Amino acid sequence: MTVVIGVLALQGAFIEHVRHVEKCIVENRDFYEKKLSVMTVKDKNQLAQCDALIIPGGESTAMSLIAERTGFYDDLYAFVHNPSKVTWGTCAGLIYISQQLSNEAKLVKTLNLLKVKVKRNAFGRQAQSSTRICDFSNFIPHCNDFPATFIRAPVIEEVLDPEHVQVLYKLDGKDNGGQELIVAAKQKNNILATSFHPELAENDIRFHDWFIREFVLKNYSK
């Protein structure tokens, strides 16, 4: 039985996610206990084939509008709210899966999944985007130097359900007026959210490999 990872391909950086998952499958296939495949997802028939879904960075407003206008929103909503499925939202994907937005909320009809309040464009304009070396070793073994790229990135301003949402990583406050910024979190063991773009870490598949091992395969084996 093949476990299928879908990458939402309505808009945004979906190809980069596909390539990273493909690289994981090629390089680690002997270490995964299940056969894996990856596919782009543009409609409900493709979505129905998936066990997990990555919602990429891009433009959350455009993503939301396309899903509504094509009649795809309800299918996406049902998928991500199914506890047997796995969802990962990166950057715009984090915005799209969140329950609340603290700014520009009327522009995006979210999937109302992740129980957090999110601020859009918290890092400013595109010219203020940056890559920061982050120590994720508290949740990814030996990953203490990951290049996390933030592009007009959102941040999690508030966790609305601390019982089920776990903060995985905060940026230190030295460049943010002393305020720590939540940029990675998970809800239960099947929903992951990141402000940054792991798919833009060239030739570095550690984050995607961890997602596959800790979310996709563990959830599938239940």
Swiss-Prot record:
Pfam families given in the database record: SNO (PF01174)
Entry GO MF terms: glutaminase activity; pyridoxal 5'-phosphate synthase (glutamine hydrolysing) activity
Reactions it catalyzes: aldehydo-D-ribose 5-phosphate + D-glyceraldehyde 3-phosphate + L-glutamine = pyridoxal 5'-phosphate + L-glutamate + phosphate + 3 H2O + H(+); L-glutamine + H2O = L-glutamate + NH4(+)
A Gene Ontology term for the protein's cellular component: glutaminase complex
UniProt-annotated binding residues for L-glutamine: 58-60, 120, 151-152
GO aspect biological process, one term: pyridoxine metabolic process
Keyword terms of this UniProt record: Glutamine amidotransferase, Hydrolase, Lyase, Pyridoxal phosphate
Top-rank taxon, per record: Eukaryota
Family: Belongs to the glutaminase PdxT/SNO family.
Name this protein carries in UniProt: Probable pyridoxal 5'-phosphate synthase subunit SNO3
